[in-house]
Amino acid sequence: MSLLSRLAETTDDRPGAVRVGDRSLSWVELRRAATAVADDLRGAARVAVPATASLETVVGVVGGLLAGAAVVPVPPDAGPMERNHILRDSGAELLLAAPGTPDADAASPPVVPLDLARRSDRRHPEPDPAATALILYTSGTTGAPKGAVLSRHAIAACLDGLADAWAWTPDDVLAHGLPLFHVHGLVLGVLGPLRVGSRLRHVGRPHPERYAAAGASMYFGVPTIWSRIAAQPAAARALRGARLLVSGSAALPEPVFAALAGLTGHRPLERYGMTETLVTVSARADGVRRPGTVGVPLPGVRTRVVDEHGGPLPADAMGELQVRGGTLFDGYLNRPDADAATRTADGWFRTGDVATVDPDGAHRIVGRAATDLIKSGGYRIGAGEVEDALLAHPGVREAAVVGTPHPDLGQQVTAYVVGDGVAEAELIDFVARHLSAHKRPRQVRLVGALPRNAMGKVQKSRLTEA
């Protein structure tokens, strides 16, 4: 089966199948425009695409996939150093560029212009499922971004698993305003509709009023988006006609979950994944959705929770989540050392995330092992639990909890809070009344904003560097 099976097979020429902002293409127009791009690639093995939120990005990515090239999305906000690293490290042979794209510099490969007015009906052979589809660059805490190599098979396995879990069909209309250089926005949010056959409405910047006006059956968002929608009741109520509200890329705070459920009539559906693994765990459309849980493994995916020595842990015990299955990446490009560090001797991928699994199989992500598992005075404290307790205070708008050095305890619980008229001592006492005493923050720092990346994830390393 073709990776973009519905797009490859359709004869549907009705307007508006794929809409980005106020511009759209029918299925047939998209296929013919992307095929014209594929014709221009002349057998290039790797092609870079400036991944703006635009129809040009959709056509460029699809054109590269039709041609059998590995597509390298370049974040539009990447600085010169990051951009040059991605282009050099990926070995991109061509750069697809839309009108208005900044002029290429010495580090750029030859430019192929993207012209959405061109059409072609040529048929390109379907590449081997094991062939690379995407090279997505992901940043760690140190060093330059690493290119995660994702095969066509892995993407297909992920999307088919999600179609099963979410009852995702051609009758759906998907709306979101996510960046198109990450798994969430590009793989799930663009390639998903092209494989399933559902219509796509990318709203541009993810403002609540744009989500409210989209009239979709499915919505994708990160917690920051959902928090802003929940803060605008009229926008949230406009989503009552939807079928699924999907949240990912970070944990959805329980107060936001509750607010959305009350305003929209829908309990949000959470899922879990990484660039390296794609989505591996998700709540199901026909299953129970509980705040703080991300569901069960997708078909073909296995998970386990292990201790610091790699030993298996029982249900409800907190440890590192490891996964295996058909959605996993092929490795880091040019970095066998980094790739080897993520694999166990028996073939499991080390996510670096701390999790628990309930007796019924529901997964709960506590956070990153490096930043969200706090070891204080012999206790293991999950940062997310303390964050949820802080967010239950009416004066707290945002909260991030980290472990910081303590001369006696090893680490202490330190909270960074964005709030209105709250005091440090008040918040410490509030948490102590709701959680075990050892989980209360020893220090609360009131800040104007929390540092976030393009996907809305709090960058905790920047908090502790400040």
Where are these regions (language model features)?
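Conserved AMP-binding/adenylation subdomain of ANL enzymes
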Residues: 156-173, 181-218, 232-233
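Conserved ATP/PPi-binding loop(s) of AMP-dependent carboxylate-activating enzymes
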Residues: 296-300, 311-342, 362, 381
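Conserved AMP-binding A3 loop
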Residues: 26-28, 133-160
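AMP-binding/adenylate-forming catalytic core of the ANL superfamily
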Residues: 325, 330-331, 354-439, 449, ...
